[in-house]
């Protein structure tokens, strides 16, 4: 159950987002400098618009506004709501923030080996097996882990939970890089918090493949299949979808 205090904080974020977007809502399409070029191209699709679009310049302005709304939701709104719900924060282990973390050469080598085998199709994602290879303490030299951040980071008693929030349509080449970052991130957090259980996930705000009449529902297996290479690099247990 979400507390009243958290409900009020979420409501405030919604009001802020609405206020900012109301101020930028298109009123005059003539100010859209790109409209003449877009309009010329869109005329080629006029037979597909039918009666749904009567004002192409305004349609272009509205599309630009919607793109800005998508950016706002993806870059800040979902993240802020996640922080409120979990009492978490954004955490960046980079040279410019909390500093890069160290992992052992063995941990780094094991992470690279996991990635190579997944990329070549030699193995399939297996969270238990992968964790056993990176959650280790050994005497090999320490090296820098890849700089990484977690859009949502919180200490939940006996465990550290990190979640990288992504758009629901990630780029086709993202999955390998995200997996590499998460593997080294988990290895680094394991060394930094040796008495904690470490969890690191990819998180998504909703399932775009689900019935729009049931906006809080999801089908994780179907969603993962819709994302290029997600099943190649991630186990189902590594993915979180808001509901």
Can you describe what each PLM-predicted range is?
Residues 168-189:
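Mg2+/Mn2+-dependent nuclease catalytic core
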Residues 2-5, 9-12, 140-142, 203-207:
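Extended alpha-helical scaffold and adjacent linker segments that couple domains
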Residues 66-69, 134-141, 167-173:
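Surface-exposed cleft-lining segments at the edges of enzyme active sites
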Residues 1-102:
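Nuclease-adjacent, charged terminal/linker segments that flank catalytic cores
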């Amino acid at each position: 159950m979400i507390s009243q205090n958290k409900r009020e904080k979420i409501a405030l974020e919604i009001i802020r987002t609405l206020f900012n977007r109301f101020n930028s809502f298109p009123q005059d399409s003539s100010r859209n400098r790109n409209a003449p070029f877009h309009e010329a191209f869109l005329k080629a699709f006029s037979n597909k618009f039918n009666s749904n679009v009567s004002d192409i310049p305004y349609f272009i302005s509205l599309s630009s506004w919607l793109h800005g709304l998508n950016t706002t939701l993806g870059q800040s709104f979902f993240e802020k709501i996640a922080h409120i719900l979990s009492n978490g924060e954004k955490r960046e282990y980079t040279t410019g923030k909390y500093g890069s973390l160290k992992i052992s050469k063995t941990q780094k080598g094991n992470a690279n080996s996991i990635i190579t085998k997944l990329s070549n199709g030699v193995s399939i994602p297996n969270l238990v097996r992968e964790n056993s290879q990176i959650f280790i303490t050994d005497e090999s030299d320490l090296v820098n882990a890849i700089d990484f951040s977690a859009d949502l980071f919180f200490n939940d008693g006996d465990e550290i939970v990190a979640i990288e929030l992504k758009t629901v349509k990630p780029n086709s080449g993202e999955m390998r890089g995200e997996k590499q970052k998460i593997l080294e991130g988990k290895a680094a957090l394991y060394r930094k918090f040796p008495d904690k259980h470490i969890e690191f996930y990819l998180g998504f705000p909703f399932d775009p493949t689900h019935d729009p009449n049931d906006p809080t529902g999801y089908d994780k297996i179907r969603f993962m299949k819709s994302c290029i290479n997600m099943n190649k690099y991630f186990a189902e247990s590594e993915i979180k979808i808001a509901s």
